[in-house]
Amino acid sequence: MRILAFFATGSEDAEFVITVDLLRRARIEVLTVSVDDSNPVALSHNINVTPDRKLSDLGDEEIDEFDGLFLPGGKIGVSNLKKSDRLMSIIKRFNDKKKLLSAICAAPTVLAYKDIMSGHKFTCYEGWQGEVDGIYNAVGVMKDENIVTGRSLNYSIDFSLLIIEYLLGSDAKEKVEKGILRRE
C-alpha cells in the first residue's frame, strides 16, 4: 500500500510526524509531499521538515499509483492546503475512485472544500465542524466508507491505527500496537 502525506507551512507537527511514523512501521509506503515550494517546510511549532517530494514535481500518473492520502491539521497549514488547486483536484479524483482520504483535526475542512464530506460521518477539532457539510460526531476517530477522520493531536495514534486497519487489516494494526507497547 502507498499513501501520499500532504503537508504545508503551518501543518500540525505531531499529527504529521506520528501518522507518517506509524504508517511506515506498518510497512505502508508513505511519500511526504509539500504543497509549498519551500524546503524545508516550517510546521506549526517551528519544526522544519524536508519533504520527500514537492507537489509541483509529481506527475498525475505517479500520483494515481497511490492508494490514498493523509492530511494533517493545524490552522495555518489547513489554510495553505486549501490554497492548492492541484491538491483539491487530487482529493476529488481519489474520492471518485474510492481511495482512502484521511484527515485529522481541522483538515476534514479541506475535504469539505470540494463537498466530499457531504452526507458522510466525520469528526474534527471542536469548532471546525460548522465548515463541514457532513454528519459530525464528537468522537476521537471515525471511518465512513473511504474516509477516515480524527479529532485532534490527542487521537493521532488512534487515527493512525484506524488507517492501518482500514488498509491492511486488524493483524497489521495489532502488530503496530504491540510494537509501540500500546497493548501489553
Question: What residues fall within each predicted segment?
Answer:
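Active-site-adjacent pocket-lining segments in enzyme domains
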Residues: L4-A5, S11, A26-S34, R53, ...
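A short, Lys/Arg-enriched amphipathic alpha-helix followed by its capping loop at the start of a domain
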Residues: I18-I28
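Short glycine-/small-residue-rich flexible loop motifs, especially phosphate/cofactor-binding loops
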Residues: V20, N39, P108
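N-terminal beta-loop-helix "entrance" segment that forms/cooperates
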Residues: V33-K54
